[in-house]
């Protein structure tokens, strides 16, 4: 255990509905079947790795991020509002040919923030491309659902 607040590798437990009403419905049922579903974890390692190019325009005091992301609108919202502290119109996020992703390219990653931030610091475009092997340890893994 690394931290008391996170004693295991469970990301979250998602409870939904009215437990008392559900228990009552099962108690009245003529037949009840119990199943346990396990959807194994996978590593969505696409042939095309994650990549990002950050560009800062001093003339416009605005950023452009070209990124292999499956959800550029949310990436812009999260990065502008919660990371860089910018109004959204000061950050343009472009997602051209994303390639494969299988869900792993839907998140905001630190590398996207760093290339964007660094482009202003050095007043030049900054490009970063992952190696496929690092995707195994750096990209978000998929699934690993356990439903009872």
What are these regions (language model features)?
Residues 1-148:
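Structural alpha/beta core scaffold segments of enzyme domains
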């Amino acid at each position: 255990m690394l931290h008391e607040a996170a004693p295991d590798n469970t990301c979250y437990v998602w409870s939904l509905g009215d437990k008392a009403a559900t228990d009552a419905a099962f108690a009245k049922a003529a037949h009840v079947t119990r199943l346990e579903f396990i959807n194994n974890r996978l590593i969505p390692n696409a042939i095309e790795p994650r990549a990002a190019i950050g560009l800062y325009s001093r003339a416009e005091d605005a950023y452009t991020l070209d990124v292999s992301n499956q959800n550029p609108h949310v990436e812009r919202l999260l990065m502008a509002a919660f990371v860089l502290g910018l109004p959204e119109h000061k950050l343009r996020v472009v997602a051209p040919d994303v390639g494969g992703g299988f869900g792993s390219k839907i998140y905001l990653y630190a590398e996207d923030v760093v290339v964007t931030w660094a482009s202003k610091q050095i007043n030049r475009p900054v490009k970063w491309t992952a190696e496929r092997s690092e995707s195994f340890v750096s990209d978000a893994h998929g699934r690993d659902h356990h439903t009872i």
